[in-house]
From Swiss-Prot:
Region entry Disordered, spans: 1-22
Native organism: Yersinia pestis (strain Pestoides F)
Keywords assigned: Ribonucleoprotein, Ribosomal protein
UniProt entry tagged with the keyword Ribosomal protein: yes
NCBIfam families referenced in this protein's UniProt entry, alphabetically: L28
Entry protein name: Large ribosomal subunit protein bL28
Family recorded in the similarity comment: Belongs to the bacterial ribosomal protein bL28 family.
TM annotation in the entry: none
GO molecular function, one term: structural constituent of ribosome
GO biological process: translation
GO CC annotation: ribonucleoprotein complex; ribosome
SUPFAM superfamilies: L28p-like (SSF143800)
Keyword Ribonucleoprotein applies: yes
């Protein structure tokens, strides 16, 4: 399963670790992803999404029905 938020599209990004001597070594910054079940009142069922913490805030703000419609419009499965 890829490390991508199904709502926001956040994915891992790369950067550097910096030691005290300012030596740079490559590292990855991973999104804060969680598998979360959401109740969809219109479909009378739970939907499991892999979402970031920000994705959960977006769902709280817009509503799960609207977010699922956007995911469907992009052609993704959930």
């Amino acid at each position: 399963m890829s490390r991508v938020c199904q709502v926001t599209g956040k994915r891992p990004m790369s950067g550097n670790n910096r030691s005290h001597a300012m030596n740079a070594t490559k590292r990855r910054f991973l999104p804060n992803l969680h598998s979360h079940r959401f109740w969809v009142e219109g479909e009378k069922r739970f939907v499991t999404l892999r979402v970031s913490a920000k994705g959960m805030r977006v769902i709280d703000k817009k509503g799960i029905e609207t977010v699922l419609a956007e995911i469907r419009a992009r052609g993704e499965k959930y």
